[in-house]
Amino acid sequence: MKKAIVGVCAIACAGLVQAQAKWDLPSGYGANTFQVQNLQQFANEVDQLTGGKLKITLHPGGSLYKANEIKRAVQTGQVPAAEFILSGAANENPLFGVDSIPFLATSYSA
């Protein structure tokens, strides 16, 4: 009996290890924009580095949530991750507006 229980537990645990997580990642930017191209590269790298155990599906152009709804969707746990214009939340915290200061970065890699 003990061997049977151990066997069932081993099979159940093996199924958990092989489980695949799927995340939806909304963006307010259109599919052909620089921002979404970066997100696609990120999703591809996550897929590769996790051995396919985490799949991220992009939803550009407000196809899952409108741009002004995305931040709230993350806050309420409706999606695990998202991309949105951080400076749009500068009224909540002035630091969120740093990315909209012109000429702060001198290059893409800066």
Predicted regions and their residues:
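N-terminal signal peptide c-region/cleavage motif recognized by signal peptidases
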Residues: A14-Q18
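Short, glycine-/small- and polar/acidic-enriched structural segments
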Residues: K22-D24, Y29-A110
